[in-house]
Amino acid sequence: MLDSNVKQLLNEQVNKEFYSAYLYLDFSNFYKSKGLDGFANWYNVQAQEERDHALLFVQYLQNNNVRVTLDAIAKPNVPMDTLMD
């Protein structure tokens, strides 16, 4: 049985991993819109890696009979208007 603090921290990490994936996907969309397909692809790969991390934590928690709580994913607050941003 997992300690309640460990459960909470792991659940928080699941949500952080999904937020990171969301952020990388936002970067990918930005670079794609600028015609920089290589950068867009790199950020897509990073987004997938973050989703994979989240799912590993989910699986671990589920295997330990812990119900995962998925929070809303916040909109990334990173201004990206130019390549210099």
Task: Show which residues each predicted segment covers.
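Iron-associated oxidoreductase/ferritin-like identity signal
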Residues: 1-85
